[in-house]
A protein has these predicted regions:
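A short core secondary-structure module
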Residues: 4-26
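An extended, acidic, His-containing surface patch that forms the Zn2+-binding/catalytic region
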Residues: 28-93, 97-101, 112-122, 130, ...
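Phosphate/pyrophosphate-binding loop motifs in nucleotide- or prenyl diphosphate-using proteins
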Residues: 126
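A short glycine-threonine-serine/GTX helix/turn-capping micro-motif
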Residues: 1-7, 92-95
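Residue-level recognition of well-ordered beta-strand positions that form the cores
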Residues: 105-109
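Short, cationic low-complexity segments
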Residues: 15, 134-135
Length: 245
């Protein structure tokens, strides 16, 4: 109580350091953490995609994230910097004292357009240039990460799968260039050099990773039909070459 105005507040310093990295609407302020551009084929397949939270999901906020992008482009074609948790002092038993320490756990969701090995050096340089030498930057889990992967929508294997699904369902499928979450897909796409296609069978309000995670019977039935047709065409049809480029 007697030190206000005399010593720095770790919570205030950390809050301002975070504000130097991400804006009030969630937009990333460092060019090094953002994709340089969205490939034309990616932008084309996302142009008509409408993002919804489902009956029980959260409402999609149209004005959140990078300005000038659609919600679909923000989640599937752009990077995000998320603050997952933040702590200063002892929130469970607050004292009238300036907190000496503060910590924030953050996450960068990134596409293939940026090398993630450059993220921490870019953040360090950005903070140092703005006088935040007292804010440490590090990575959890001993540097482990799932690297981004993407098979461009105009790839021959994507178009082959599109035709198969359309013939089975009688409807044109929605094509995504990649998912917005973490997947170990780079093991197949990069290490093994295989074209990878994911065919998810779920819906937006499935409560993924929650205690009541679930799937709907009609979607599972449709998924069984789709995959039966896909594997039938795989063994019976005219296939593209087995290569990723």
């Amino acid at each position: 109580g007697n030190w206000g105005g005399l010593i720095s507040n770790a919570g205030t310093r950390l809050a301002n350091a975070l504000a130097a990295l991400v804006g009030p609407k969630g937009e990333i302020l460092l060019p090094e953490l953002r994709p340089e551009a969205i490939p034309p084929s990616v932008r084309d397949v996302l142009a008509d995609l409408v993002m919804r939270g489902g009956d029980n999901g959260p409402m999609v906020e149209e004005d959140w994230g990078q300005p000038g992008l659609t919600p679909a482009e923000r989640v599937f074609a752009w990077n995000t910097f998320e603050v997952l948790a933040i702590k200063a002092g002892n929130p469970d038993q607050v004292a009238n004292a300036i907190p000496p320490k503060a910590v924030a756990w953050c996450q960068i969701r990134f596409t293939v357009d940026r090398d993630p090995d450059g993220f921490l050096p870019a953040i360090r340089a950005h903070l140092d240039a703005r006088g935040f030498h007292d804010v440490a930057v590090g990575q959890k889990h001993d540097g482990f990460m799932m690297r981004a992967s993407r098979l461009l929508p105009d790839h021959p294997w994507v178009q082959w799968a599109r035709r198969s699904l359309a013939e089975t369902t009688g409807a044109e499928p929605t094509i995504l260039p990649n998912l917005g979450g973490s997947l170990p897909n780079d093991v197949f796409a990069e290490t093994l050099g295989l074209p990878t296609i994911w065919v998810p069978h779920s819906y937006a309000a499935c409560s993924q990773h929650a205690p009541n995670e679930h799937a709907l019977a009609p979607l599972l039935r449709e998924g069984l039909q789709i995959m039966t047709g896909l594997f039938w065409d795989l063994g019976d049809g005219d296939l593209p070459e087995w290569k990723t480029v």
